[in-house]
Amino acid sequence: MKILVFNGSPKRENSDTLHITHAFLDGMQEAAPQEIQTIHVTDRRIAFCRGCFACKHNDGRCVIDDEMREILEQMLSADLLLFSFPLHSYGMPAGLKNLVDRMLPPCPPWP
């Protein structure tokens, strides 16, 4: 199984949240070997979604040329997506929220 982990903490490897995530992943590795890749969202160049919906008329391709294209390909090839983040003001950190907003292109079109 291929697992893609999104670390949304601005503290990257020093994040308490990521330490908990590693404990969870260690348990999964003990149960059955997994291929695990971690993306530190803070280290990636991901522009804000413009809300233009060009992706809905452009075969699911976003018009913004940044690292999100590569990330979307990794997401689509993964068997499991794991979002690891601390709560900031009862929500996810801004960088991870930005990534989630940019996940729109591969979604099926709505009526």
Language model features: what each stretch is:
Residues 31, 58, 77-78:
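Structured helix-beta-strand junction loops
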Residues 63-111:
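Helix-loop-strand module that forms the ligand-binding subsite of alpha/beta enzymes
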Residues 38-60:
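N-terminal beta-loop-helix "entrance" segment that forms/cooperates
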Residues 11, 44, 90:
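Surface-exposed, flexible loop/turn segments at secondary-structure boundaries
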Residues 18-21, 51-54, 96-99:
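Short, glycine/charged-enriched secondary-structure capping and boundary segments
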Residues 15, 47, 91:
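Residues that form or flank phosphate/diphosphate-binding pockets in enzymes
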Residues 1-32:
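N-terminal beta1-alpha1 ligand-phosphate binding loop
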